[in-house]
Amino acid sequence: KLIENYKDGSLVTRNDIFFSLCKSIIGQQISVVAANSVFLKFKKKCKGRINAKKVHALSSASLKSCGLSRLKVKGIKDLARKILKKSFKPDLIKKMSDEEAIEYLSELRQIGRWSAEMILLFTFNRSNIWPLQDIGLLRAISNNYKKKYFPPKSFLKKLNKKFTPYCSVATWYLWRSIDDEPIQY
């Protein structure tokens, strides 16, 4: 039913893990509008090209002036440093299972399970991501399946089983049902 309602758009990969991780860190625990505003300022500081070298060269004060918290600045600076020193190796993720990749990504500062799942879904186009910490997904499930918010765990497991191995696609369509703008990271 949802697929028929949202024929335009699709899951699109940016194929740039540094960009996506920065966007994920910036967007944590703030509204989409606030995240977009901060991200635009961040992008401007990077002169339109977001990469580890440019971000590493920026001062913490410069990053804070974009509206980033001290912890987010530390997370982004640490990520840039690890990419440049090659102590974080994104290419390894391609060979990992979803759970192994989530654990590996979660070793990064400011990256938890939810952020790791967003990276797997949007950057690596993994097909079976079911991000149950995502409030939007839980709200969409409640709306579309006439369940109370938070849907019962037993129901979430049933849906997971139904949508496997395409939970990522189901997630995307469920998100679309509550937000006309296709989500991208």
Q: Locations of the language-model features?
A:
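N-terminal polyanion-binding entry modules of DNA glycosylases/AP lyases
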Residues: 1-96, 158-185
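Amphipathic alpha-helical segments within well-ordered protein domains
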Residues: 22-23, 27, 60-64, 102, ...
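Long, compositionally biased
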Residues: 86-89, 103-104, 140, 144, ...
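Catalytic DNA-binding helix-loop module of base-excision-repair DNA glycosylases/AP lyases
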Residues: 97-142
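Hydrophobic/aromatic-lined pockets within catalytic cores
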Residues: 124, 145-146, 178
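C-terminal end-helix/capping segment
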Residues: 134-149, 154-161
